[in-house]
Amino acid sequence: IEVARRAGAQAVHPGYGFLAENPAFASACAAAGLVFIGPPPEAMQALGSKTSARKIMEAAGVPVVPGTLDAIPTPAEAADLAREIGFPVALKAVSGGGGRGMRVVERPEDVESAFRQASDEAAASFGDPSLYLERLVVRPRHVEIQILADQHGNVVHLGERECSVQRRHQKLVEESPSPAVDAALRAQMGEVAVKAAQAVGYTNAGTCEMLLDQQGNFYFLEVNARLQVEHPITELVTGLDLVAEQIRVAAGRPLSFTQNSVARRGHAIECRINAEDPAGGRFIPSPGTVTALVPPQGPGVRWDGGYEAGDEVSPYYDNLIGKLVVWAPDRPAALARMAAALAEFRLEGVPTTVPAQQAILGHPDFVDARHSTVWLEQRLALPEPSGAGPGDGDGDGGGAGGRSQEVRVAGRWYTIPRPGVESRPPARGRHGGAAGVATASGTVTSQMQGTVVRVLVAVGDVVEAGQGVCAVEAMKMESVLKSGVAGTVAEVKVAPGQPVRAGEALVVIEPQAAGPGSAP
């Protein structure tokens, strides 16, 4: 606010992070005589609490996933409620979103540990440990509706975005329109999104996120009271400038269009390019220095980036480097254009998600639109680093690497340089130990630079293979490290709050002695 005053600014646009959904900041702007380019703080307050939002939406006739309407005070009460609703369930942060402070629970015996993990993560991320509970929608699609509302009573929707390709409940690839939504369903979901905005007196840009089940039923998830990261794909298919409309609304002017004038054309896809190593499907946050960055160019290709060569990717913030977006007349052409753009993308110095996104776009399940929010982690097996070829593990996040795969899109074949991809389900538990490696000797080491947030064991504890021993956070992502062997905890080398380096030993497990009937 002080910077805005010194600059002589009249308004503040909060972007899509940090303060964008903070009602206290919006109120502080108003008190300082600055226009906050976003929704009113009252609407943000109502939607910021997920339980409050669920109550409001249920009263307004918006379909919500069965679950609790209030915070759950204890793990024991959570277990009782989960039994009533029926497993599997999802524990979620009352004050947050984006997959943080969320745990899926499939068995009663896992409720207590999941509750504590989700609560700790919610407290660290949002300053509020409160949780609520929902029935888990099995293999849903994540479909969201873009809304815009002015101060003259006009509320419109701009259709949907499909955001089902996720790891750790965070989006990696988005597209519009959704291949699972027809015109009738789009109209129904759009009507519900408009109703949700009207229920809280919403103005400016926002997104109503929903889950679409396999039977075609949809449920309210939350309203993101800000401009979304993935808004460019809506801009490309509608031809509208969402930021310009935000400024127009904040200035007190009506929207420049009506619902009937919204026309959607073609297909757009966005890949979020993150500083993560996707090898083995672990998506390990990878801070460091960007030594070279050359995004692709050409018709229908857009790059919204926040870094250039020489910039440092910090371990303390979100690891999004930029957004690669393409538009084409239809989905097959958009897939081909994105495949070509990813192959041309060049970034050196830190690993990126590009190899995973190349694998995703070439997978038959994605090409045929058979994916869901759990598809990436359950169906896509990304290779372990092999050390073979210039693109393996050298920090080159581009398409080069000496390997290629033939990918068929809409009857045409394209050669895409990228690591291999298996179209079989990965090994169970592949994603559970995302931040660490347990050696055969029982030493659990960190694979990334980060901070220990929890130690889950003590010296002398008996652990099973696959049991969590500590949690490490890096770049706003928390990962639980698991023991690779059954045995007894011999040494705990770290404490909560302690920074750790990649490769640093965290916990030492003395392996359980082999029984007489064990194989040699």
PLM ranges: what are they?
Residues 148-150, 211-213, 293, 306-308, ...:
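Short beta-strand micro-motifs enriched in acidic
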Residues 193, 232-435, 501-504, 516-520:
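Catalytic cores of soluble metabolic enzymes centered on carboxylation/carboxyl-transfer
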Residues 434-520:
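Structured functional modules or segments
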Residues 106-107, 326-328, 511:
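Short beta-strand-to-loop capping motifs
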Residues 100, 177, 318-324, 440-442:
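Short amphipathic alpha-helical segments
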Residues 152, 226, 239, 318, ...:
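ATP/adenylate-binding site constellation spanning eukaryotic-like Ser/Thr protein kinases
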Residues 1-208, 212-228:
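N-terminal beta-alpha lobe that positions the nucleotide/phosphoryl donor
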